[in-house]
UniProtKB/Swiss-Prot annotation:
NCBIfam families for this protein: reco
Family in the record: Belongs to the RecO family.
Keyword Nucleus recorded: no
GO biological process annotation, one example: DNA recombination
Identification of the protein by name: DNA repair protein RecO
Amino acid sequence: MEWRDEGLIIGVRQYGEASVILEAMTRGHGRHLGLVRGGRSQRMRAVLQPGNSAELVWRARLDEQLGTWAIEPTQLRAATLMASAEALHAVGLICALLRLIAERDPHPDLYETAVLIAGHIGDERLAPLLVRLEIEILRETGFGLDLSRCAATGAREDLAYVSPKSGRAVSLAAGAPYRERLLPLPPFLRDEAPGGEPTPQDVLDGFGLTGFFLKRDVFTPRGQGMPEARRAYLAEFSKRQERSATE
């Protein structure tokens, strides 16, 4: 068997003395693993860094086998990652999130979002896209949020909260008596949200929202903690905001 696809490298682990097992998120074949012979060579180590994009050819005698990769890099991002701890941790977070997807299960829209983010990994305005990626991960793992209308009234305007029980939006008026028990819904995640760049607090509220559901519904049931890359990314994001506030 053989197929060709484009992919985003999300992980590498040693296999024997000279080879590695490469994990990639591909457009048409989902999260997929394969052996890269000679993958520990100096030349290949630079190619096989998480966050790089490549044209991939997978070959195996049978579909259920691990198979082997042939790799042609299309975008190397090491220089950007070495220049920014925030970008480095953002890539780590992307990879950790994509590993939540079942192996060999195609998710082309999720792939497109991940590649879009990776392509702008050095952009300091990246954070809202990472929040949206986490929302997509929740949806693709069966825990999608409904942020389109109020769970109590059906209204589509003035949505301000999310119920931690149902994952559904709640309007400002309907949620006012219970606001201490609800999660804030930042404006940039609402359908009727005006244009403009989200504030740092909006972004942190977005991560707080997605983080609550990711921890409760996805990571904890799998016996996993929240990704260290996520904590590190948010720490770097917050430090940058503090520096900006004092300049």
